[in-house]
């Protein structure tokens, strides 16, 4: 279990090259500065930004094979987890979906500043996004599982990998959805918190 900022930084460094680490350092610096202007993340979490946001996002890579297609991140907010993934693996195509204007501006600015040619921002509600096939679907603190699956099912295929950090509610939320959806997922322990878990799944979420 990651317990310190140093451990979190080392965890991330093991999963990307030096250029990736430089991009992540730049992202952290920009986040600290932008958070003075808009509430991208809670002030309290900035003191543990590597544990709470960066490593928390980076750990999803351990559940995803390297060759998957488009990584679709729903409700990216400040960029977690999608922007972190895009910065660590610039060969991975990533689409960040976010509806709030100021957050869309922040994400767009960061994609430009970090020179992430692999990463696009869809500044709109997910409901309005044109259907496309996603190799990976991620979403942290986006919506309750039932709603999340209903909104994103149309982007999934038989080979889609789902990585859904769900905090302490993971197992309970999974029990609350229909059996056809339960079958797709299992619960993985988060490495950033004893209490948190990630719903990892594979396949098409039929509606
Ligand atoms: C609680 S925040 C989480 C942000 C980020 N994923 C994180 O974990 O730090 C949820 C984000 O989802 C966005 N959002 C909520 N509903 C959405 C929708 N239907 N389409 C696109 N974005 C949405 C919100 O604007 C907000 O930025």
Swiss-Prot record:
Known EC number: 2.1.1.170
Keyword annotations from UniProtKB, A to Z: Cytoplasm, Methyltransferase, rRNA processing, S-adenosyl-L-methionine, Transferase
Enzyme class: transferase
GO molecular function: rRNA (guanine-N7-)-methyltransferase activity
Localization per record: Cytoplasm
Catalytic activity as recorded in UniProt: guanosine(527) in 16S rRNA + S-adenosyl-L-methionine = N(7)-methylguanosine(527) in 16S rRNA + S-adenosyl-L-homocysteine
Cellular component GO terms, alphabetical: cytosol
Domain of life, source organism: Bacteria
Pfam families per the UniProt record, alphabetical: GidB
Principal place of residence: cytoplasm
Residues holding S-adenosyl-L-methionine: 75, 80, 126-127, 140
Family per similarity comment: Belongs to the methyltransferase superfamily. RNA methyltransferase RsmG family.
Stored HAMAP family: 16SrRNA_methyltr_G (MF_00074)
Entry function: Specifically methylates the N7 position of guanine in position 527 of 16S rRNA.
Name by which UniProt lists this protein: Ribosomal RNA small subunit methyltransferase G
Gene: rsmG
